Design a protein with these regions (language model features):
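Non-globular, low-confidence helical/coil segments that flank catalytic cores
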Residues: 2-8, 20-272
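Hydrophobic core
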Residues: 12-18
Length: 272
């Protein structure tokens, strides 16, 4: 990554935005509290990665409606935990999906079963997305980095995705913890990125110094709820990010966060 060529424009505004300077790619980190949901728009194509909890279905529905998104090229569930899969039913009830993916095709929970049922209503199946596969979203390229092994601990089965759009890149980590992180780093599978989605809401069980040395992120986003009972984000993770000189954005503090880019310059807009 040619960091010296990357001009960063940070605009934090109180009144939420309707227009950004750059329109080629937008990555929305949606404030779904203690959960994850990310909307990616690129060159007229859309991807939804996770959808928060079941209670967030109406929020996701409204968010897509606000941005007039009626077609999703990809709906991706990083792993079957409810705080990632629950609200995807709202998305599938509003927008037509082309393909639907998860790290599993079956999982015994009501939230995941509802996700499968709503996928089937569109005459689609939940496909297992495996390491090594590459997807395109407009001119952006997305590579599936992991998981490369399946683990008894569901968080370590999170899909890890690396998105590249010209000189800008994002690393999406789901709830990846140290074991999955280590398995990818040992095989040198994690590249540098401009923006890191911090794994597992900033849990103390994720985001090692080794990862940060590999990724060298300029920005990090933590999707986390206010006054959550898990002490997320953990102070140790915030300290590591500070040591890495990474600028941190948090949905509990900043609300919805949108990164917009033309592939060279980056604009960051937040709700608060």
């Amino acid at each position: 990554m040619k960091k010296n060529l990357l001009k960063i424009i940070c605009l934090l505004i109180i009144s939420f935005f309707t227009t950004s300077i750059f329109a080629d790619i937008k990555v929305h980190f949606i404030d779904v509290g203690q959960a994850d949901s990310i909307l990616i728009q690129c060159d007229g194509e859309n991807l939804l990665l996770d959808g928060g909890n079941k209670a967030d279905s109406s929020l996701i529905f409204s968010y897509l409606k606000k941005y007039e998104i009626t077609n999703l090229k990809y709906v991706i569930n990083s792993h079957p935990h409810e705080d990632h899969v629950g609200g995807l039913s709202g998305a599938l009830n509003f927008a037509k999906a082309n393909q639907v993916f998860s790290s599993f095709s079956e999982y015994n929970s009501k939230a995941f079963n509802d996700f499968v049922k709503n996928t089937e209503k569109q005459n689609l199946q939940v496909e297992v997305l495996k390491a090594g596969r590459e997807l395109s979203l407009g001119n952006a390229k997305i590579k599936v980095l992991g998981p490369i092994y399946y683990d008894d601990k569901m968080n370590n089965n999170s899909l890890v995705l690396h998105l590249v759009y010209d000189e800008i890149s994002f690393l999406f980590t789901g709830d990846m913890e140290f074991d999955e992180e280590r398995s990818l780093l040992d095989l040198d599978l994690i590249p540098q990125c401009t923006v890191l989605k911090v794994a597992h809401h900033g849990s103390e069980n994720a985001t090692s110094y080794r990862l940060l040395r590999s990724v060298l992120p300029q920005f990090a986003v933590i999707s986390v709820g206010k006054n959550n009972p898990y002490n997320h984000p953990n102070e140790s993770v915030l300290s590591k990010l500070e040591d890495a000189q990474t600028k941190v954005f948090r949905t509990d503090l900043n609300g919805d966060i949108i990164f917009s880019s033309d592939g060279k310059e980056l604009e960051i807009l937040s709700e608060r």
